[in-house]
Regions:
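Conserved active-site segments centered on acidic
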Residues: 1-71, 136-141
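Small/polar loops that bind or transfer phosphate-bearing groups
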Residues: 29, 77-78
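Phosphate-binding/catalytic loops
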Residues: 68, 74, 80-141
Length: 141
């Protein structure tokens, strides 16, 4: 969900600024485990994104790898288990690139996980708040 929310917010930010938008974004997501590799976006997530006019067609889960640490400026996890696994996969975090999404909101907690609760609305709210705060940090806004 976060990949597509962030893409949507970044596209809107860029559209509002036109030629003045001098920041390039490369936004992607990857799993920290092998459980969902190759799967499409979870149906509940697809529905919630569609409610907000955001598509996710063609996305298939891939696993994060050590090369992602060199490729990206920020590596964002949804929960503390993600952060632990990301740090392990990357062999540490010497450049301080690994963060939790809600850290950017000042809330030191995990994004609500709809896997067991089926509460995609709470997850949407967490992801939107985190992505909005992250975009503001990246753009100085």
């Amino acid at each position: 969900m976060a990949e597509f929310v962030m893409r949507d917010l970044a596209a809107k930010w860029r559209a509002e600024r036109g030629a003045a938008a001098d920041i390039e974004f490369e936004i992607a997501s990857a799993a920290t485990s092998t459980e969902q590799l190759g799967n499409e976006v979870y149906p509940g997530t697809r529905r919630k994104l569609a409610e907000h006019g955001i598509g996710c067609a063609g996305k298939r889960a891939r696993q994060m790898n050590r090369g992602d640490y060199a490729r990206y400026d920020y590596l964002i996890g949804m929960d503390s288990l993600n952060r632990r696994d990301m740090t392990r996969i990357c062999g540490g975090d010497p450049e301080g690139k690994i963060h939790l999404l809600l850290d950017f909101t000042g809330q030191k907690r995990d994004v609500a996980d709809p896997w067991y609760t089926d509460d995609f609305e709470t997850t949407w709210n967490d992801v939107l708040a985190g992505c909005t705060a992250l975009l503001a940090k990246l753009t100085g806004g």
